[in-house]
Amino acid sequence: DQEYLLLHSCPPHFYTGKTLTKEAVWDFSLWTRVEPDDVMPDGRIFIFGHTPTECYQDKLPLSIYYGNGKIGIDCGSGNRHEVCRLACLRLEDMKEFYSN
């Protein structure tokens, strides 16, 4: 079975800062954006938000991003724009759902 890691933003084990405090790692994990070439080292698929999918692909309206062991699900629902919407991904069959 496939394993997933669901986080708001960047996985804490991507942290490479010199200050290894709980607060520093927390701040990193909360605010750092995932890069297109970031890969989970343990084979899990990393599902994340925080960064709208338009930063990774040119699809309108915004849609779920798949790439390099990552799935981006932030389709900009917090923004009031016609191309932004809420996304949901059912992991059992990878079926996508979107708000109108």
Feature roles, as predicted:
Residues 1, 86-90:
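Short beta-strand scaffold segments in enzyme catalytic cores
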Residues 1-72, 76-82, 98:
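Acidic, His/Gly-enriched loop-helix segments that form or flank divalent-metal centers
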